[in-house]
Amino acid sequence: MYKKATLAFAGFAGLALSGIAGAVDVHTRTIASTCMTCHGPGGRSLGAVPSLAGLEQDRIVTLLKEFKSGARPASIMKRHASGYTDAEIEAMGAYFASPK
């Protein structure tokens, strides 16, 4: 009986954690979608604005943190990057670096 209760608890815990992971993924996609207005669908630029898709995660994170701190001058990107936490910046870096 104890074994069944333990297995049931593990199953419910797994379901709860998968829901949390899904919520994080939705949040990341939502904030990443704001980038797509200028950087194109999926981060693939259709114009003069640089593409984000396919850049390495570290590069995206570094650029966003430099924009946020003011180390890299840019009026528009500073305003955008300033609204994100470091965790959100990391998540966006991973999102655009991963193949879709």
PLM feature segments, named:
Residues 1-9:
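Bacterial N-terminal signal peptides that target proteins for export
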Residues 16-21:
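N-terminal signal peptide c-region/cleavage motif recognized by signal peptidases
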Residues 28, 42-72, 78, 82:
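Gly/Gly-Pro-rich "capping" loops immediately C-terminal to redox-active cysteine motifs
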Residues 33-41, 92:
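The canonical Cys-X-X-Cys-His
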Residues 38-45, 97-98:
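Detector for the c-type heme attachment site
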